[in-house]
Design a protein with these regions (language model features):
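Bacterial Sec-dependent N-terminal signal peptides
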Residues: 1-25, 260-262
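Beta-propeller fold recognition
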Residues: 22-369
Length: 369
């Protein structure tokens, strides 16, 4: 009986180990040298004070499956795990003032190659590009053998990624500027399929003054939906269906107007959408919830911020949604994002950043349904 019990315990430990080991989004670097590290379930993330990066908006972080830092970037500079700029990693063509300036996609066929996608600010001519990081170089600290490879130009400040339905490859999604066109690129073990983009004409026109390019793009945790915030003149949130097999975007639903719509994030169960807006010129920071099970979205104002501006939303590994508060030493937190209405419990000063400050952005990650 004792031997049987021991075998059962060992089997349970072996089954649990892979799930526990997959922690690629446990480290966040963002804002004014701010950071967070997420621990076991039920614990509060702890602030990090070792970042060398300042970014007004976007950032991205690469970690091992165990949550060990590899590198981070604001779309212009890449810092290695020793918090030093990588060789050839200081002139990427993103921008710390682009909503989603950077996104890191691991090569599906290699544990050593990573692709850093960048988007220019305000529909600028640098467009959507990618750079290649090889972690076998520089004595394991990483280097960039190729940088700033152009995919398409111009684009909005929107950049998101989700795992393919095959469970291996990754779709990278952006939006053309002066267009209704989403553009999707597949990343496989053979690399970025740059010559074979998937085009989807759906939803609102992304055009006008450069500031209209502002606003985030985010996939739902189950990968079936994608949401966008359209800033200023457009002033709305949109939700679309996404096909993880074909890379196609379809069936737009619009909610608005919400002046200066900026950030979007889905609840862990993918049924509720959250969006931030600040009012024309800022000063009226609001957090809205939309129930995607209803026809009109049942829009509910679930929180206001004492901060003049709030920005990006990001679902954490702990199942809570974090809210960037511009120039503030604390993030807002949606404590129960699966709960409809104000039961979701928004806390404006939800977590302190250890003396560092948030800007408008939070790190961008590949969604892994």
């Amino acid at each position: 009986m004792k031997n049987l019990l021991l075998l059962l315990i060992m089997a349970a430990a072996l089954l649990a180990a892979p799930a526990q080991a997959q922690r690629p989004a446990d480290l966040w670097y963002f804002g004014q040298q701010a950071g967070l590290t997420f621990g076991p379930a039920g614990t509060t993330p702890a602030p990090l004070n070792n970042s060398k990066m300042t970014t007004f908006e976007g950032s991205a972080v690469a970690s091992t499956a165990k949550g060990e830092l590899l590198f981070y970037t604001n779309g212009t500079t890449v810092w290695n795990r020793q918090h030093r700029p990588m060789p050839n990693g200081t002139q990427l063509m993103g921008s710390g003032s682009s909503t989603q300036s950077a996104l890191v996609v691991p090569d599906p066929g290699s544990g050593n190659i990573f692709y850093v996608f960048t988007v220019a600010p305000q529909g600028g001519r640098d467009g959507l590009r990618y750079s290649i990081i090889d972690m076998t170089r520089a004595e394991g600290l990483g280097d960039l053998p190729r940088v700033n490879l152009l995919l398409i130009q111009p684009v909005a400040e929107k950049l998101a990624a989700v795992r393919h339905a095959n469970g291996r490859d990754v779709w990278v999604l952006a939006h053309r500027w002066n267009s209704k066109m989403f553009v999707t690129y597949l990343v496989t073990a053979e690399g970025v399929q740059a010559a074979k983009p998937i085009m989807s004409s759906v939803g609102s026109l992304n055009a006008g003054p450069g500031r209209n390019a502002i606003g985030a793009l985010q996939f739902s945790p189950d990968g079936t939906k994608v949401a966008a915030a359209l800033w200023r003149e457009t002033n709305k949130f949109e939700v679309y269906d996404f096909d993880r097999t074909t890379g196609k975007v379809s069936n737009a639903r619009s909610f608005g107007p919400y002046p200066e719509a900026y950030g979007v994030a889905f609840s862990p169960n993918s049924q509720l959408l959250y969006g931030t807006c600040n009012g024309e010129g800022g000063g009226n920071s609001q957090l809205w919830q939309f129930d995607l099970r209803t026809k009109d979205g049942s829009p509910t104002l679930v929180g206001k911020s004492a901060n003049r501006k709030i920005g990006s939303l990001q679902l954490g590994p702990d199942g809570r949604i974090y809210v960037a508060r511009e120039d503030n030493p604390a993030l807002g937190v949606i404590q129960k994002p699966n709960d409809a209405g104000k039961a979701c419990t928004y806390v404006d000063e939800g977590i302190k950043l250890g003396g560092r400050r948030s800007k408008l952005g939070l790190p961008n990650f590949v969604v892994l349904p």
